[in-house]
A protein has these predicted regions:
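Domain-length accessory/inserted modules outside core catalytic folds
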Residues: 1-127
Length: 127
């Protein structure tokens, strides 16, 4: 299955993943949770459902249609296809790969200020 892997403090990358529950759990380091972003473009974000409880490193912010942060994913996650008319995950299309590589292109750093989470994109040297 063609996926986009997103790890804390790293740029996302395209890779292949066996289409099995065990492979998905190994990929995120535990039991999985499926998250659908607003306007998710027929894709699902698969993360460790205990990432925050296990104090895994914060990874990327999820935003609503207005660009406001509504959640932060802790630990590694991947994006795969999730057709609305199917219960199975699928490979991403070329268009989905391009979109999700851009969507999560920059690693993010998080700071809590006055009960609000501030997200700072991390620029690579020379950018």
């Amino acid at each position: 299955m063609r996926i986009i892997m997103v790890e804390p403090e790293r740029r996302p990358y395209e890779t292949e993943l066996e289409d099995s529950l065990g492979a998905m759990q190994r990929c995120v380091g535990g039991t999985i949770e499926v998250v659908y972003e607003p306007g998710g473009r027929g894709a699902a974000l698969i993360c460790n459902d205990e990432g925050k409880l296990l104090n895994l490193p914060l990874n990327r912010a999820l935003r609503d249609e207005k660009g406001e942060i509504y959640d932060v994913i802790a630990g590694p996650f991947f994006i795969c296809g999730a057709p609305p008319d199917s219960e199975n995950f699928t490979s991403l299309t070329d268009e989905q790969v391009d979109y999700w590589l851009r969507r999560f292109a920059k690693p993010e750093f998080f700071v809590r200020v006055n009960d609000k989470v501030i997200c700072v994109p991390v620029e690579e040297p020379g950018q």
